[in-house]
From Swiss-Prot:
GO cellular component: cytosol
Organism the protein comes from: Buchnera aphidicola subsp. Cinara cedri (strain Cc)
Keyword Transcription regulation tagged: yes
Sorted UniProt keywords: RNA-binding, Transcription, Transcription antitermination, Transcription regulation
InterPro entries, per the entry: NusB-like_sf (IPR035926), NusB_fam (IPR011605), NusB_RsmB_TIM44 (IPR006027)
Biological role: Involved in transcription antitermination. Required for transcription of ribosomal RNA (rRNA) genes. Binds specifically to the boxA antiterminator sequence of the ribosomal RNA (rrn) operons.
Domain of life: Bacteria
Keyword Transcription regulation tagged: yes
SUPFAM superfamilies: NusB-like (SSF48013)
GO molecular function term, any single one: RNA binding
The encoding gene: nusB
Protein family: Belongs to the NusB family.
The protein's name: Transcription antitermination protein NusB
A GO BP entry: transcription antitermination
Amino acid sequence: MKSKRRKARELAIQVLYSWQISKKIVLFETEKYVIEQNKKYSLDKIYFHKIVTGVIKNIFYIDKIIKKNISKKKNRLDYIEQAILRLASYEIIKRLDIPYKVIINEGIELAKIYGSNKSHKFINSILDKIITNKNNIKIKNF
């Protein structure tokens, strides 16, 4: 059985993915729709809302953090990888109550479910770099 937070992360990835594809969507309506479609699952709705809005409110800062930790060879992320990295980066910087191991593991599991064949290895590598370089991140801007 999946934890309520795992389900919240899965649904957050779906909302962030939709938002990335069409920035015109109304976030509140999309969140409501995703929750309604998944009401049979146990879900931490408050956490779901916090992570979705937290990522979107801080999107430019989060993207800078990700970009600093990605190899120049990988110049373009697919939408799923990007959504997973954005969510996990937000948790690394903002959710100090969650151990880094949990954040990395959740990112890897989401990549295995939704990403391409080797996405989970890529996600693991980038999240590890972000955590390693976390002390160089100016949190006051976040």
